[in-house]
Amino acid sequence: MTDLTTFHLPERITNTEAHRELGQAMVKAWRTDGIFQITLSKPQEQTTDEAFAESRQFFSQDFETKSRHVSALTYSGYIASREEVTAGEADYSEIFTICPDIGLEDARVRENLPCHGPVPWPGAAYRDRMKAFMGMLGTFGERLLQLIALGLDLDDMDTFTRLTQDGWHHMRVLRFPTVQSSENARGIGAHTDYGMLVIAAQDDVGGLYVRPPIEGERRNRNWLPSESTAGVYEHDDGWNFIKPMPAVLTVFPGDFLQFLTGGHLLSTPHKVRLNTRERFAMAYFHEPNFDAWVEPLEADAAVAPIHYGTHFTNMFMRCYPKRITTRRIMENGLLDKLPTLSELA
C-alpha cells in the first residue's frame, strides 16, 4: 500500500507559475506512483454518491432484467460477469458501459459506423445521474489535461484538450462479486487502459492495485498488436494496493498519453482482486474525438499516427469477442468504414 499524492483541482486553469508548478507535481506523482488523487467538494461528492446509488440499484436486479440492456450498434450496455476477457482469461466484473449516447437519426448511425448508437439505458433516473457524474468528470478531465500540458513544459496548455473536443468520453460502471477468500481472487486481470486519461471512483471496500514505474522494467506499447499489456507482470511483485479514501477520485494516464509523450508518461498497469464484500467502482475515460488522428508530440517518421476510433473499436472487439456488437461489425464488414493510414496521406 502507498500513500497517494492528493491535489485540489482549480476551477479554471491559467498559464501561471502556480499552475505550472501544480502540473509539474502531478507529472512527478505519475512518474513516481503511476496514480494520484483529486479531492471532491461536498456537492461533487453528492453527485458521485448519487451515481453509486443508481449503480447498486441496477446491479441488484436479476440477470434477465439486466441483460435486456444491450445493443448491437454500440458497446454501451450491460456486460455480464465473465463476458469480458483479459489476456485470454475471463474477468469476474459485472459492468454497465456508457459510451456517447448517439440517436438513431444521427448520420453516423444511419451509415453504420462501428460503435455509434443510443445507450440502452435501464431508466431515466440512471441516465440522469450517470450523465451528471460524467459531465462533472468531463470538466475535471479538461482541466487535468491542461495542467499536465503545463507540467510537461509544453508551449500550449491546450495541446491535449484540442484532441478531446467532442471526445469519445465514456465510462465503465462496475460491480465485483464477493468471494470466500480474497487471496489471489481475480476480479480483472492486469492491463493498461487503451485511452488517454482515467478518472476513477471506488467505494470503501478496496481491491484496486496499480504498478508504478519501475526503473529498468520494460513497459509494452499496448496500442501495438504485438505488445499487449494484458496479463503482463500480473503475478510479479511490485503492485501497490490503492486504499479507498473518502471524497477523492483517482487519476492515472492511459496508453495515449504514453504514446503522445514518447514514454515520458507511462500508462499505468492495474488490476482488481475480489473481496469478501461486494465492491462497486466507476471508471471514466476522457478521450480524443472518435475521428482524431493522434501523433507523438515529438515528430517521429518511424511512428505511425493512430486513428482513435479504429483503436477504440479494435480494443473493444478484443475484450468482447462474442458480444453481439462485435458479431455485427464482423458479419457486416463494418471495419471497412473506419479510416486506414493510407487515407491520411
UniProtKB/Swiss-Prot annotation:
Name of the molecule in the record: 2-oxoglutarate-dependent ethylene/succinate-forming enzyme
Enzyme Commission number(s) of this protein: 1.13.12.19, 1.14.20.7
Transmembrane segment boundaries: none
Name of the top EC class for this enzyme: oxidoreductase
Reaction(s) catalysed by this chain's protein: 2-oxoglutarate + O2 + 2 H(+) = ethene + 3 CO2 + H2O; L-arginine + 2-oxoglutarate + O2 = guanidine + L-glutamate 5-semialdehyde + succinate + CO2
Leftover remarks: A dual-circuit mechanism has been proposed in P.syringae pv phaseolicola for the complete reaction, in which the binding of L-arginine and 2-oxoglutarate in a Schiff-base structure generates a common intermediate for the two reactions.
Self-association and partners: Monomer.
Cofactor field: Fe(2+)
Keyword list, A-Z: Dioxygenase, Ethylene biosynthesis, Iron, Metal-binding, Oxidoreductase, Plasmid
Entry's family note: Belongs to the iron/ascorbate-dependent oxidoreductase family.
Domain Fe2OG dioxygenase: residue ranges: 167-288
Function: Simultaneously catalyzes two reactions, namely formation of ethylene and of succinate from 2-oxoglutarate.
GO MF terms held by the record: 2-oxoglutarate oxygenase/decarboxylase (ethylene-forming) activity; dioxygenase activity; metal ion binding
InterPro entries: DIOX_N, IPNS-like_FE2OG_OXY, IPNS-like_sf, Iron_ascorbate_oxido_reductase, Oxoglu/Fe-dep_dioxygenase_dom
Binding of Fe cation, residues: H191, H270
GO biological process, one term: ethylene biosynthetic process
PROSITE patterns in alphabetical order: FE2OG_OXY
One Pfam assignment: 2OG-FeII_Oxy
Pathway: Alkene biosynthesis; ethylene biosynthesis via 2-oxoglutarate
Iron found in the keyword field: yes
